[in-house]
């Protein structure tokens, strides 16, 4: 084996520099500079695709969190950046990791209603049974906020429990009626839930069914769907 003091000569020129020789002799070749904590999270929260890609290439953890425990991928979901979510999921980000408020990348979709981002989160094989701080799945807030296409996608593309009851005693169907405005979006959501087999007989903690709530609130179109 060659001695480390030997230099490779090409055309009589010494090609091994003193600096490299020193690094070899001490066993400490240059290492990449560590990525400062928080940079990846900030880039993800801003939907900065270029920044996230660069930081991941430099060795940043795809599961970096902020002070509230929110992960970078959850922040990217709230930012509505599908490409940022794609990069983080491909790098191994945990889409199930929940923050101090019990939100995560999948549950956040019930709030945002962004189906393009859902496509990327599903690549991470999320546990669709996890619940938020109200004890609800992603379907429930999607239903009450009037996110028609998200409700459709969750019903068509996941195994989410359509009749899950949250801590308030409400299913997605109940919440679509109680917290909805009775308008076209919530009418369509009620149709989707009923067509997918939602149990219309499940009442709230007082025993009132979705139909009874719709009648009490004067939502005639929804009454006609549920009756």
Features from the language model and the residues they span:
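Bacterial signal peptide processing site
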Residues: 29-31
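Ankyrin-repeat inter-repeat connecting loop/turn
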Residues: 62, 95, 128, 161-162, ...
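Leucine-rich solenoid repeat scaffolds
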Residues: 194, 200-227
């Amino acid at each position: 084996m060659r001695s480390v003091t030997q230099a490779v000569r090409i055309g009589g020129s010494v090609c091994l520099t003193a600096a490299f020789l020193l690094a070899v002799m001490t066993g400490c070749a240059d290492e990449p500079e560590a990525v400062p904590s928080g940079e990846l999270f900030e880039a993800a929260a801003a939907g900065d695709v270029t920044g996230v890609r660069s930081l991941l290439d430099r060795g940043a953890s795809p599961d970096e969190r902020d002070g509230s425990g929110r992960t970078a991928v959850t922040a990217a979901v709230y930012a509505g950046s599908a490409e940022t979510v794609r990069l983080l999921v491909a790098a191994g980000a945990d889409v199930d990791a929940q923050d101090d408020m019990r939100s995560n990348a999948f549950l956040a979709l019930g709030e945002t209603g962004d189906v393009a981002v859902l496509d990327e989160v599903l690549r991470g094989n999320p546990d669709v049974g996890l619940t938020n701080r109200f004890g609800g799945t992603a379907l429930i807030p999607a239903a009450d906020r009037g996110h028609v296409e998200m409700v459709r996608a969750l019903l068509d593309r996941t195994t989410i429990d359509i009749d899950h009851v949250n801590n308030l005693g409400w299913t997605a169907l109940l919440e679509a009626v109680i917290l909805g405005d009775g308008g076209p979006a919530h009418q369509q959501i009620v149709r989707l839930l009923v067509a997918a087999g939602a149990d219309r007989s499940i009442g709230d903690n007082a025993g009132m069914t979705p139909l009874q709530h719709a009648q009490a609130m004067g939502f005639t179109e929804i009454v006609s769907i549920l009756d």
